[in-house]
């Protein structure tokens, strides 16, 4: 198990908040973001943990840090997230309600004249 800390970081993007997970040697091993939107909404954005540091509680620590920050500073706002199947149970435990299902689609862009 790796010792790590979570710090809040400043971003250059307006209304974007982020947290970084660092090892005790200050190696970045994870991050999580959120964006404050119009109409008192907060979009929970991407979270990432380096492959070699997964399954050590880093994602949960990042998520809980962001959650505590939101509860302290954004009472009355509505938080939402586009969730992968692996995170749905955590969101349910936090009281999130399921919305519509969304399907990921992709296409390689080609200059077809």
What are these regions (language model features)?
Residues 83-103:
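Conserved active-site alpha-helix within GNAT-family acetyltransferase domains
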Residues 34-38, 51:
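Short, low-complexity Ser/Thr-rich regulatory SLiMs
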Residues 19, 30-32, 42, 47:
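Conserved GNAT-family N-acetyltransferase fold
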Residues 14-30:
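Conserved beta-hairpin
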Residues 70-84:
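Conserved GNAT acetyl-CoA-binding A-motif
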Residues 55-68:
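Conserved acetyl-CoA-binding loop-helix of GNAT-fold acetyltransferases
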Residues 1-10, 111-113:
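Conserved N-terminal entry element of GNAT/NAT acetyltransferase domains
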